[in-house]
Each structure stands twice: as structure tokens, then as C-alpha cells.
């Protein structure tokens, strides 16, 4: 900023501003000036553009006009939300000195820094989505990754081994803000992400990280958290924790532990799989018609966030899954009673985080009280449920009768938004506060008692006590009796027919009244802060209760979904395989206007791969995706859309379904397809579920067919993964004859003339044809084009009906081999239209073709 160069020439106020701004050069500084937050110089210009507010000038300093923009303090949350959504960070600078006693500018300091990943204010957060701060670290052995949800205290770290796994973690967690080291090598991995923050190398130092974490948790080492031997993850976690403390300017008592996320604990899904399965976000970037949109009927925001975490991280521990299944089954008869009560609990998790940060507002405490008031009824309802896991949840949620009583006594029924507005603490909670309020409201009998006493003492029957806005309190005596006024009466005002006096006692009362509002508000703020001190010792138990309530909400929701949508409880088996009877796509069946056609599926060690053929639009992709979604739902403990399901161990789910050009990275559709295919072939195991849809479409027919054939062979013979392999290459239907564990299935269709009816029914065996021309006609391709295509199809089929099959059946074609050169005579003939030639032109063509042979 050029203004800093001539520092001494500025006014004292601008010098104060420039000193504070120098401490936060890269972010906007909201500088409190009375009822406004003001921004100056470059900050003002930037804020004017980002917030669409007026850019003005605030006088001059150092001989130069000062660009300025301002926002009212009472509307600051709306403007902060706009800035945070654009990835900006803001330092909030408040007046902490008393203007009445300050010599020079009022003392100010930055009290907090609002960044996209560290927000906890209700107005700035999306209530049904996690808001994560993340840090990434890399060395020669791999990556370290840590995430923190400051609005709940959830702190996680992991050590992705390679670039693909790291990309999948970024896709899964989708952090609002990402910290990275200044020498981070894999910039292409994070470029374009929101909220990127470059940090100095020393913030990732391992010894500093251990020290920071031990200090935060009050421990001597990190062995108890299971992260002691995760140096890369700890480097990321240390940087993240330091950043959180720096921005919040307070201790973080709600961050009490850190958890290691290990690959073997959950089913791994790469970024492409999460995108293709449309778990919480559809391919267009919205939330409609996703798996979450069908499954998420939770009644609390914290329950919704927990369900989404489950969906993105299916667990492999069958003990956990069986417990969830048992709980869902036990709760099915109680959903109608439980959900209305759970709805009243609200977002206790985030309220507790604001309590820990000491930023909780009066209405947060009122909502906390309301949540506590639901616990007795919830506990009574759950007591009748015959389920050990349910009873364990009941115990974890606690009762908190003392805290409920405290908040019922302390906070009025409908408090104002801010404590500075006053009127938050209930009457009767504090005697001194009640006295100050009574003085402020004039709701005391002191003046009446004073008047009676003074009349009796003086014997003056015209004496009365009163008040006016100009002179304050007074004792009035009629002019006829004024000569009898006692000696301690000091004249305050003379009227035509009366004299007004003041006495020391009344003056003292007047001073009390005049300062009572300020003193009442100051005491109220003090009592409000003391409430934090009374609540915070119970923070650990309260967080445990919030977690139990969120889990109960998820399980009650899944019980309701299972009953309403006719889902069944899947059975887990020991051997690899998936057997589905009458399976349905959970999302598609909800958006169809006609009944969904349910289909079976059988994958086992003896039947590891299904080659799926059938018409385009026939339902191949739907059938494949529904299998993956049923597996995913089973591995979060949910019931599934089928008549019966048996499912074995799954370590990863891969999808190679559809593709588009990756223009940002300069990769074609085919390159994207091959990159995803390579990832599958390198990382799939016999316990993986693999969906391969139309491999080889983006290149020449023989290249594509050869690749598809080789990929299928590798998956079936070497990897032995459970594979659904959809293809338009009918030559691949020969694979079951040549390899064990491969079978053909197809989706049926009926063709009548130029029309086609899709049956969407999966049958054993290969499809008889692709129905491509019928689908083209259905799409509205002109009739003359369809007619010409049919003619060309007959020609090709008559020339070499089995050429491609023969080619693949023999030695696999090399992508690097040089194809046979096409004869120039053949090329010339292909472009020749005989019907348009004159006799002379025809004769010339004969001689030309002769010369080409």
C-alpha cells in the first residue's frame, strides 16, 4: 500500500489503521468507526467491487484523498457471507477503548479473522453441509492431509499414498479452505480449488506440530489417538491447528481429540466414482436427484451432515454395520413419535462450537435450552425400544437437568439477537440487575416513599416529588409555603406559583437512574459471560450428547426411509460376491412416472464378470449404477432397494462411466477414459466392485475393441474383481466361451418397424443386436439419414459379418502397429457417385482407376 510509505504524515487515526493493516496485508480489514465498519485505500476499492457498494472518499491524509467504503455494523453478517462465498477472508477490528477517556484515537484491535474454513456464525454456514478447513503436505513418501470442522470440533488426518488417493480425498471432503506449503509440488492437484492459502514451510514442521497438538489436548504424546506414527498427517494437522488458533484469537476447547482415517477402515471411492454415482451432487453440480436427496429426510441439520459423511465414507467393519441394521429394524415402529421431538433439538452441535469459541448468541442459548427440554421425552420414548444400541445412544445423550434449569432461570423466553441489545437475562435471576432495571424503568416506589416522608417531616401539605427532562428530579413546594422549606433544600427552579428544590438524597437517586441503563447492560453482559463459564465445564458431555442425537436422527431417518420406500435388510457374507433379487435404482425409481423394472444380479467367485449388452437407452448404465448404490447403501448400514440382497466384502468401488473432455487439463475424452481405466487396472483387487461402461468408444473401432477385450481379460483373469462390463462391441460376448467366471447378460428391447420399446429387463445371454438405428430414429434423426444408414449397414454386414470378431479372436491388435494402407483406387471409388456421371466422365474414371491399381 503506497500510503504506508509516508507514514508520519498521516493523521493519528490513519496511522493506527495502517499499523493494523500491515499485520494483515493480504486480507480485507473491517475497521470499526462508530456504527460502521470502514475500509480504506485498496481494501475499499476491492470491497466496492466484491460487495457492489459505493466507493467514496474520507477526507485526506498525508495530502492525499482516502478511498473509503463502509457497511453498517448491524448488517455485517450479510456482507461477510458474500465475501466468504467468494473465498475472501476478513479481519474484524473493533473498538476496545472508551472514547470518553481516550486521548487520541480510540484503542482498537483485530478480535477475529473470518475465513471460509473457520466460520462458525450461523448466518455464514450452510446448515446441512460440513464446512471444512484442510491442510495438505507432501514429501517423497506421499501426502499428509488434515481436516477440521471448527463448527463441531471434528479433527481428522490421513496419509494418502499416491496422487489418485489424494485427489479422491479432496473430492470427498471438499474443503472450504485449503492450506498448502509454499514449496508444494503437485499444484495441478489443487489448482482451481476455492480458498487456497499458501503457508510458510516452518508451519508444517513435525516437532512444532507434535508440540501444538499435545498442548491442545493436554497430553504428553499422541499415542492414545493412534496418530503417533503418521508424520505426514501430523505436519498437515499442526499447520491447520495453528491457523485455526491465529484466526479465532481464542482457545479452542471443543477440539479435544484427533482421529486417524485409514484406507482399510472404509470402502475407497476415487473422485470419478463419487462424481459418477451422484452421491450428494449430481453431474450438473446440483443436489437434485442424488442418492442423498432420496435418503436424507433427517430432521436436524447435524443429522443431515452426519448422513452425508456416512455416504461418502462407507465402513467395512461388519460389526458396526450389523449394529446399525439392528437399530434401524428396532426403530421402524417408532419413527412417527421420535421425529417430531428430534426436530425440536435443532443444531446443538454447532451451538456448542460457538459456546466453546465464546461467540454463542442469546438465541443460541435459548435453542440449547429448548434442546435440553426435549431430552426427557426422547429418553422416555427410547426406553421402550428393545435394542442394546438404542439404549447405548439413550445413555450418551444424557439429561442435563441442572443446565436446563440454569438456562430456564437465566434467559428470557424470546431473547434478542445480540446481548448488546439488552433484555437477555430473565427477571429474578440476579437481584442487582433487577434493581438497576427497576431504576432505569422508573418502576420503584422510592419517589412515593420520599414524598410521604418529606411531607410528614416538614408538615408542608403542598410538597410533592416530580421529574422533568430538563431539570431532572425535584421536590416542589407552593410559593405560599416556600418560605418554610428546610435549610437542606437547594433551589433548582423557580416557577410562577411554586419553587422546586433538590436534596442530596434525591440527587444521589437521580445519578443512579441516569447511569442505571448503562450499568444494567454492563451487568447483563457480565452475567452472560458467566453463563459460558458455567456451561463450558460440561462441554465434553454436551458434545457426546449432540453426537448421539445426530446419530439417532440418522438411524430414525433410515428406518423411516426403509419402511416408506420398501427397502430390505441386506445380509453380509464372507466370500466375495453380490446376489441381488429384484434390485432397484434408489433414485431413478423415485423420479419415474411408471413402475421401475426391478432386476436380479449374481456375482460370485465363479461368476466374477458380467458382459452387459443391449440397446442404448436400454438401461445398462442404470443397472450398473444401481448395483454400486445398493452396495454403498449396504455398507453404511442402511436397508436397500431390493427384495433380497447378499453381499460379500468390498474394499473399493470403481466406475468408468461416461466421460467428457477435461479442457482445463488439456485432456481429450479418450484420454480421460484411459486415465480412469489405468487407475482401475492398477488398484482394483478381487474384493473390488468395478463398473466399466463402453470402454474404447473414443478411438477407432479396432483400437477400441482391442482395448476393451484386453481390459476385460485383465479384470477377469488377473485381478478377479467383481465386474459389470457394459459394451457395444458384440465381439466381447465371446469372452464367456474363452474364460471362466464370465457370463453374458443383456437388456431386452422389442423393435417394430421404425419404433422400439425398451423392456429394461435383464436377461441371461447376449443381445441379438444393438438397435442403434432404432434409437437414432427415436431421437429424431431425419428419415433419409436413417434410410441411408440401414443401406450402409446391410453393405457392411454382407462384406464381412465377422471381421472384427475374427481379428480379436486371433492375436490381440497392437495400438502401435501400422494399419494396412488403403488402396488409392478404393478411396477414389468410395467418393464416386456413378449416377451423376456422363458417359464421357465414366470413361475418364475407368482410365484413372486403371492408373491407380
From Swiss-Prot:
Chain positions recorded as ATP binding sites: 614-621
PROSITE patterns referenced in this protein's UniProt entry, alphabetically: DNA_MISMATCH_REPAIR_2
Biological processes annotated in GO: mismatch repair
One Pfam family, short name: MutS_V
Coiled coil (residue ranges): none
Annotated CDD domains: ABC_MutS1 (cd03284)
Name of the protein: DNA mismatch repair protein MutS
Gene designation: mutS
Amino acid at each position: 500500500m503506497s500510503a504506508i510509505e509516508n507514514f508520519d504524515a498521516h493523521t493519528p487515526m490513519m496511522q493506527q489503521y495502517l499499523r493494523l493493516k500491515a499485520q494483515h496485508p493480504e486480507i480485507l480489514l473491517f475497521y470499526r468507526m462508530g456504527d460502521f465498519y470502514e475500509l480504506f485505500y485498496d481494501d475499499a476499492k476491492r470491497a466496492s467491487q466484491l460487495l457492489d457498494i459505493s466507493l467514496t472518499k474520507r477526507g485526506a491524509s498525508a495530502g492525499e484523498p482516502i478511498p473509503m467504503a463502509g457497511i453498517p455494523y448491524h448488517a455485517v453478517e450479510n456482507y461477510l457471507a458474500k465475501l466468504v462465498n467468494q473465498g475472501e477472508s476478513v479481519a474484524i477490528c473493533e473498538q476496545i477503548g472508551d472514547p470518553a477517556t481516550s486521548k487520541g484515537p480510540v484503542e482498537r484491535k483485530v478480535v477475529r479473522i473470518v475465513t471460509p474454513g473457520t466460520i462458525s456464525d450461523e448466518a455464514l454456514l450452510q446448515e446441512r453441509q460440513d464446512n471444512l478447513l484442510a491442510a495438505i503436505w507432501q514429501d517423497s513418501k506421499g501426502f499428509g492431509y488434515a481436516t477440521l470442522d471448527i463448527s463441531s470440533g471434528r479433527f481428522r488426518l490421513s496419509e494418502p499414498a499416491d496422487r489418485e488417493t489424494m485427489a479422491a480425498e479432496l473430492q470427498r471432503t471438499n474443503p472450504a479452505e485449503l492450506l498448502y506449503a509454499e514449496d508444494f509440488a503437485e499444484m495441478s492437484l489443487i489448482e482451481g480449488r476455492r480458498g487456497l492459502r499458501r503457508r510458510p514451510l516452518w508451519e508444517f514442521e513435525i516437532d512444532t506440530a507434535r508440540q501444538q497438538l499435545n498442548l491442545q489436548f493436554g497430553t504428553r504424546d499422541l499415542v492414545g489417538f493412534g496418530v503417533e506414527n503418521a508424520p505426514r498427517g501430523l505436519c498437515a494437522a499442526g499447520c491447520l491447528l495453528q491457523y485455526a488458533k491465529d484466526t479465532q484469537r481464542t482457545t479452542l476447547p471443543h477440539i479435544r481429540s484427533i482421529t486417524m482415517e485409514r484406507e482399510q477402515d472404509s470402502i475407497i471411492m476415487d473422485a470419478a466414482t463419487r462424481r459418477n454415482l451422484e452421491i450428494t451432487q449430481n453431474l450438473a453440480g446440483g443436489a437434485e436427484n442424488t442418492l442423498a436427496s432420496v435418503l436424507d429426510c433427517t430432521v436436524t441439520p447435524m443429522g443431515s451432515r452426519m448422513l452425508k459423511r456416512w455416504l461418502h465414507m462407507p465402513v467395512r467393519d461388519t460389526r458396526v454395520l450389523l449394529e446399525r441394521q439392528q437399530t434401524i429394524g428396532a426403530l421402524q415402529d417408532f419413527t412417527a413419535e421420535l421425529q417430531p421431538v428430534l426436530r425440536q433439538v435443532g443444531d446443538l452441535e454447532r451451538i456448542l462450537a460457538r459456546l466453546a469459541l465464546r461467540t454463542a448468541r442469546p438465541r443460541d442459548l435459548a435453542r440449547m435450552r429448548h434442546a435440553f427440554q426435549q431430552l426427557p421425552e426422547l429418553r422416555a420414548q427410547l426406553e421402550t425400544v428393545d435394542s442394546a444400541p438404542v439404549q447405548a445412544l439413550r445413555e450418551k445423550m444424557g439429561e442435563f437437568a441442572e443446565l436446563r434449569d440454569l438456562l430456564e432461570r437465566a434467559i428470557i423466553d424470546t431473547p434478542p439477537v445480540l446481548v448488546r441489545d439488552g433484555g437477555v437475562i430473565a427477571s429474578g435471576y440476579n437481584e442487582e440487575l433487577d434493581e438497576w432495571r427497576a431504576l432505569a424503568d422508573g418502576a420503584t416506589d422510592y419517589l412515593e416513599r420520599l414524598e410521604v416522608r418529606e411531607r410528614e417531616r416538614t408538615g408542608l401539605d403542598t410538597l410533592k416529588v416530580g421529574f422533568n427532562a430538563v431539570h431532572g428530579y425535584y421536590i416542589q413546594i407552593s410559593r405560599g409555603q416556600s418560605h418554610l422549606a428546610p435549610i437542606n433544600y437547594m433551589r433548582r427552579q423557580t416557577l410562577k406559583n411554586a419553587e422546586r428544590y433538590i436534596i442530596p438524597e434525591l440527587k444521589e437517586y437521580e445519578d443512579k437512574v441516569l447511569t442505571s441503563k448503562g450499568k444494567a447492560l454492563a451487568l447483563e453482559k457480565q452475567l452472560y459471560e458467566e453463563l459460558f463459564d458455567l456451561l463450558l465445564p460440561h462441554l465434553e458431555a454436551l458434545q457426546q450428547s449432540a453426537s448421539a442425537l445426530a446419530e439417532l436422527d440418522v438411524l430414525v431417518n433410515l428406518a423411516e426411509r426403509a419402511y416408506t420406500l420398501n427397502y430390505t435388510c441386506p445380509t453380509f457374507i464372507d466370500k466375495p460376491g453380490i446376489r441381488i433379487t429384484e434390485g432397484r435404482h434408489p433414485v431413478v425409481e423415485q423420479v419415474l412416472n411408471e413402475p421401475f423394472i426391478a432386476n436380479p444380479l449374481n456375482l460370485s467367485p465363479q461368476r466374477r464378470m458380467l458382459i452387459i449388452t443391449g440397446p442404448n437407452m436400454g438401461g445398462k448404465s442404470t443397472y450398473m449404477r444401481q448395483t454400486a448404490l445398493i452396495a454403498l447403501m449396504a455398507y453404511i448400514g442402511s436397508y436397500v432397494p431390493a427384495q433380497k440382497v447378499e453381499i460379500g466384502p468390498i474394499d473399493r468401488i470403481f466406475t468408468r462411466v461416461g466421460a467428457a473432455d477435461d479442457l482445463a487439463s488439456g485432456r481429450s475424452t479418450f484420454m480421460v477414459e484411459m486415465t480412469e481405466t489405468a487407475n482401475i487396472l492398477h488398484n482394483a483387487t478381487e474384493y473390488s466392485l468395478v463398473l466399466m461402461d463402453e470402454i474404447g468408444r473414443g478411438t477407432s473401432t479396432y483400437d477400441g475393441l482391442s482395448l476393451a477385450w484386453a481390459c476385460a481379460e485383465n479384470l477377469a483373469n488377473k485381478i478377479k474383481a467383481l465386474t459389470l462390463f457394459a459394451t457395444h462391441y458384440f465381439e466381447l460376448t465371446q469372452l464367456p466361451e474363452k474364460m471362466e467366471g464370465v457370463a453374458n447378460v443383456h437388456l431386452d428391447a422389442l423393435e417394430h418397424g421404425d419404433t422400439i420399446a425398451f423392456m429394461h429387463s435383464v436377461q441371461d445371454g447376449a443381445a441379438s443386436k444393438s438397435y442403434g438405428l432404432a434409437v437414432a430414429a427415436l431421437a429424431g434423426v431425419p428419415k433419409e439419414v436413417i434410410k441411408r444408414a440401414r443401406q450402409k449397414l446391410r453393405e457392411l454386414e454382407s462384406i464381412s459379418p465377422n471381421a472384427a470378431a475374427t481379428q480379436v479372436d486371433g492375436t490381440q491388435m497392437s495400438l502401435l502397429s501400422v494399419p494396412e494402407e488403403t488402396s488409392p483406387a478404393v478411396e477414389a471409388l468410395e467418393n464416386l457417385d456413378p449416377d451423376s456421371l456422363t458417359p464421357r466422365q465414366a470413361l475418364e474414371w475407368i482410365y484413372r482407376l486403371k492408373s491407380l491399381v
